Amino acid sequence: MQFGRTTLSKFVIENTRASHGELGALLIDVAAAVKTISAMVAKGALAGHHGALDSTNVQGEVQKKLDVLTNDAILRHCEWGGQLAGMASEEMDDPYPIPAEYPRGRYLLVFDPLDGSSNSDVNVSVGTIFSIFSRRAAGDAELGDYLRPGSEQVAAGYAIYGPSTMMVLTLGNGTHGFTLDRESGNFILTHANIRVPEDTREFAINTSNERFWEPPVQRYVSECKAGKSGVRGEDFNTRWIASMVAEVHRILIRGGIFMYPKDSKDPSKPGRLRLLYEANPMAMLIEQAGGAASTGRQRILDVVPDSLHQRAPVILGSKNEVERLARYHHEYDTGADRPFVSPLFSERSLFRDESRA
């Protein structure tokens, strides 16, 4: 307790007793890594942490100095405790085996060490995203152990490094936010049982890619942009930060819908965001807060990955808007949204008046 308030350590211990303390101990190690990363991000240019390296990750993205430093921080904080069978990261081509000198556990930790790292040089909020799975037995993990649907996650969370550092966590019993008290060094429960409003009038998408979107996404965004004069009959606000953690955090606090949909900009990629360590943990957090998360055609947490760095379309946030966009995808796929062309009466649209939908 901190001045009568619940600390992260107390919270995870109380909520992970069934794991004999192993899951709680792992989460406390993750929190320690988050504190280290928070200090790194805060020092920024003072410590020479800004700028890029002469290396790329498995996605072909140029690595920032902070990408590598934060990745190493998580490995060092979490590899030694005996809870893990292995780790995987956006910044590593292959799964990371636990060093031989440390005991093995039955958990798998997958993470994006610094989401939105391109924003670090311009002092915009960035974050860390993580997901935890459980194996049936302790020992060294194999690649197949990681290729499981997000519905099998036992915990997921993110840290956001902004005006304050927060860690948002779910153990499958709701979504909860903890704020770092820098005086005591403790994470304190400040946002218990976060709930995402079912309706929203705010959407986040990179509109520079509009020409590459599929028709259902173009339809949805067009309706939102039309505002009161359009079929929705209401005005919408648009947001885009280019940091998934910052976007999702805003949605958890005040509602909204975040879209990084499938597009044709690079036909070889079914989506932009990585399924295992970006889409899955965020989907679990959003669903546990009463929201929804979809690829447009499937619940994100039901997608079975076939590779470690698989990408997926992501649409998540306020439930009614996510379901509307999923319906638009279904109507597009079945042809229900195609206009009817009459030889006598020109063209009639089969779109319903969405102001009454």
From Swiss-Prot:
Cystine residue pairs: none
Keywords: Carbohydrate metabolism, Cytoplasm, Hydrolase, Magnesium, Metal-binding
UniProt cross-references to InterPro entries, sorted A to Z: FBPase_C_dom, FBPase_class-1, FBPase_N, FBPtase, Fructose_bisphosphatase_AS
Alphabetized Pfam families for the sequence: FBPase, FBPase_C
Subcellular location: Cytoplasm
Protein family: Belongs to the FBPase class 1 family.
Name this polypeptide is given: Fructose-1,6-bisphosphatase class 1 2
